[in-house]
Swiss-Prot record:
GO terms for cellular component: collagen trimer; extracellular exosome; membrane. Residues 1-22 form the signal peptide. One of its GO terms (molecular function) is identical protein binding. Disulfide bonds: none annotated. Residues 53-110 are annotated as: Disordered. It comes from Homo sapiens. Residues 80-107 have a biased composition (Basic and acidic residues). The gene is C1QTNF3. This is Complement C1q tumor necrosis factor-related protein 3.
């Protein structure tokens, strides 16, 4: 145990020895302010080069927010922007109030006249044998517009247009042949001819499409022979307007 205490006090004396030497040097030298020049020999090591700057330390914590600054001045007016796209259709608005009556309009142009209806059909209920004269029909079944004259057997065109005519005649058995002519204002358009020996009857027919002016007349004229007529109406004459013309 004794030798351990001896070693302890020797180490302690070696630790304080430089400090005591430095204090002696300091007390013997004049005081000129600051550390004595020779004290660095016992208290400090030799001077060396400055070391390199160490790396930056980690960022510190965020600071406390500052006070709200004053409002700045108004900026200059900006340029007009580009035209935007067309928006969606809006909802239907409420119904507006009824407006006032407008002024009376000008008189309009004449309208299209209604379509004129013209048609007739006549027949022979009795025999007819008056040669070279207009055929007078004893019965008129249809006379729309009343433009067929029952007394004269003639049709008068009320308007200019295109008309259709047809007739069918039965030869009387007492004659061999018969001629019938379709007349237009006194001119023969065409004729119908029927032939058969006596004692026998025969029926012939013909048709025409005529362009008539207003006031023109159309009728049938009897030539040679005789026509058969009874309640069965074998001999007929008919016509109607197809369409008007200017």
């Amino acid at each position: 145990m004794l030798w351990r205490q001896l070693i302890y006090w020797q180490l302690l004396a070696l630790f304080f020895l430089p400090f005591c030497l430095c204090q002696d040097e300091y007390m013997e030298s004049p005081q000129t302010g600051g550390l004595p020049p020779d004290c660095s020999k016992c208290c400090h090591g030799d001077y060396s080069f400055r070391g390199y700057q160490g790396p930056p330390g980690p960022p510190g914590p965020p600071g406390i927010p500052g006070n709200h600054g004053n409002n700045g001045n108004n900026g200059a007016t900006g340029h007009e922007g580009a035209k935007g796209e067309k928006g969606d259709k809006g909802d239907l608005g409420p119904r507006g109030e009824r407006g006032q009556h407008g002024p009376k309009g000008e008189k309009g142009y004449p309208g299209i006249p209604p379509e004129l209806q013209i048609a007739f059909m006549a027949s022979l209920a009795t025999h007819f044998s008056n040669q070279n004269s207009g055929i007078i029909f004893s019965s008129v079944e249809t006379n729309i517009g009343n433009f067929f004259d029952v007394m004269t057997g003639r049709f008068g065109a009320p308007v200019s247009g295109v008309y259709f005519f047809t007739f069918s005649m039965m030869k009387h058995e007492d004659v061999e042949e018969v001629y019938v002519y379709l007349m237009h204002n006194g001119n023969t358009v065409f004729s119908m001819y029927s032939y058969e020996m006596k004692g026998k009857s025969d029926t012939s027919s013909n048709h025409a499409v005529l362009k008539l002016a207003k006031g023109d007349e159309v009728w049938l004229r009897m030539g040679n022979g005789a026509l058969h007529g009874d309640h069965q109406r074998f001999s007929t004459f008919a016509g109607f307007l197809l369409f008007e013309t200017k």
